[in-house]
Amino acid sequence: MSGVASLAKTMENGASAEVGTTGNEGFVGLPFLLESEHAPTAVQMQVPGHALRLPARAFLGALERSQSLHRVLSRFAFALYTQTSQLVACNRFHDVEQRCARWLLMAHDRMPHDDFLLTHEVLSMMLGVRRSSVTIAAGQLSEMGLIEYRRGHVTVTDRAGLEMRACECYWSIRREYERLIGFAEKEYAD
């Protein structure tokens, strides 16, 4: 997958919030790995990209034939569970600017370049906040020179600075991904 996909939970009133993010390090379709036919979340591509698609029957057959595939995907599932757990705490304890910086870093880790398509509307849904809150937070990050935000397009201009503005959740999630699946961010120029 070359974009960023979000696992989003939609409430009865239609409001949605992100409960997990994946990109080139993972896959969507976790319920099949866990032998469930019901998905409690919807998958939404938040940053456009490409992905390979595999019929469920072929996926399940590959899992039956390969213990190593099952083991790798199970480790990813645990990494995603860790991320989801951390996001619950993050949404409770950290301010919008910190969460915005965390989300942008997580997306940046999964992208091949520093700029990507992203609207305030999408980011507000991912963070579970009002669009106006994202506009303020993104404006603050932009004023600090950490990002450039143009209509529907964000560029990370100072990754180190953005890392300093992000809450501890970014680092906690990243360390677990590195430990469990060997996922590490791309090399960044100073």
Model-predicted regions and their roles:
Residues 1-13, 23-25, 43, 100:
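Glycine- and acidic-residue-biased ligand/ion/polar-headgroup-sensing regions
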Residues 2, 57-58, 121, 160:
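Alpha-helix/helix-capping structural signal
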Residues 4, 48-51, 153:
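Structural motif
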Residues 12, 47-48, 150:
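Short acidic-glycine loop/turn motifs at beta-strand connectors
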Residues 18-78, 86:
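Cyclic-nucleotide recognition modules
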Residues 46-48, 63-130:
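Polybasic "coupling" helices that flank or enter modular domains
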Residues 58-59, 81, 146-147:
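Alpha-helical bundle regulatory/interaction domains
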Residues 106-190:
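Phosphate-/nucleic-acid-contacting segments
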